[in-house]
Amino acid sequence: FHNLVFDWFKGLKKDTKDYWIIERHKNSHKDESVIKQNGNLLTSFNSEYAYLFSLLHNFQASPTDTYEFLYHLPNVARRFVETFLNFKYLERNKIDESIDKLITNPVECERARKFMHYYSHNLTTDKFMKFADLAECQAVVDIIINSVNTLDPIHLTSLKTTVTAT
């Protein structure tokens, strides 16, 4: 429904349209709803997949070393790769079962897999605030995007077009 509404208004001038969202809040004694102006995130991307790619693509073009970004990058990479593989092969496999279909070089495949697992799954408190260094993040993002390009260059071009159009 969300994307359908945005498609209806795509052709209108910016100054003749606005988007609003209803946020529900639970309080201790009652539930309330607040109407708020829709943020850019919901109007800039037509899917979470496009948003995740934009994060990887923008990082590849201009790496940032802020901990706020690096902390989430392995999870962003994992979710993007899982979605790509599920879409490409119409299988709902775990990333371990299908990542080698995307990243065919065994060393690079293992490097990306470990990066996505180790830094995005905090199963114990000893891994709670560990960050991958910037060089490792850059290398793995390059591996992922280059692998998508090798496997499906038309799809990657479409993703880049979607990201640069926002």
Model-derived features: where do they sit?
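C-terminal lobe/lid and adjacent interdomain/linker elements of RecA-like ASCE P-loop ATPase modules
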Residues: 1-89, 94-118, 135-166
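Non-catalytic alpha-helical scaffolds
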Residues: 129-132
